[in-house]
Curated annotation (Swiss-Prot):
InterPro entries: FA-response_TF_FadR, FadR_C, TF_FadR/GntR_C, Tscrpt_reg_HTH_GntR, WH-like_DNA-bd_sf, WH_DNA-bd_sf. Keywords: Activator, Cytoplasm, DNA-binding, Fatty acid metabolism, Lipid metabolism, Repressor, Transcription, Transcription regulation. One of its GO terms (molecular function) is DNA-binding transcription factor activity. Pfam families: FadR_C, GntR. It comes from Haemophilus influenzae (strain 86-028NP). This is Fatty acid metabolism regulator protein. Homodimer. Signal peptide: none annotated. One of its GO terms (biological process) is fatty acid metabolic process. GO terms for cellular component: cytoplasm. It comes from the Bacteria. Multifunctional regulator of fatty acid metabolism. Residues 11-79 form the HTH gntR-type domain. PANTHER family: FATTY ACID METABOLISM REGULATOR PROTEIN (PTHR43537:SF52), TRANSCRIPTIONAL REGULATOR, GNTR FAMILY (PTHR43537).
Amino acid sequence: MQNNNDILKAQSPAALAEEYIVKSIWQDVFPSGSNLPSERDLADKIGVTRTTLREVLQRLARDGWLTIQHGKPTKVNNIWDAAGPNIIETLIALDMQSAPLIIDNMLSLRSKMSESYIYEAVKNSPQKSTALFAELEQLQNTAQDYTEFDYQLFRQFTVVANKPFYRLIFNSLKGVYQRIGLLFFKEKKHRELTKQFYLEMQQICLEGNADAVVDCIRKHNLRSSTYWKAILERLPQNLSD
């Protein structure tokens, strides 16, 4: 089994097996394109039952880490070709050096997507779009409340815009979205800047002025970019805990 320092904090045999396999893939102990050891050998090496290991392998296969070949050894995938955004939290836990780039990519994706679907939402359903800000007046001035409001606002705009694919992307990113949201919104000046953005977007929705959406989003991103740059330069090592 790997050195204890190399194993993430596992709370159960299944979690231990999953973390062992994922870290072994990431560190090229089980390189992309290779086959895993037999279930018996791997279960013995990790110290779990074959039943537990089999359940873990199936879960990792669903996430894109592995390909289970019936009657043949389980194959290790190239995660950059086979996996989806739902493994982002795992990647951040495995490699904090890559975390700023991954998070920056995620923020960029959110910005580009939101320009499109919020425009559609306001254009087609200004009243429903306005209703998304119903709780804004009661928004508590805490990092937790701002993080939750921000996530729900951007996610619910995908519902109003009838963009189910974008909604699924938000679902898959929820964990890391909330973690970095708490980092951003713990600063009062960040909350104040974002509150102003919410008020501007609320007014745009009230007026049904869809053509103003993209400019509003881009201006907010520009204003907050310096704050985000500072956050990404000093990400805490326990971000994934």
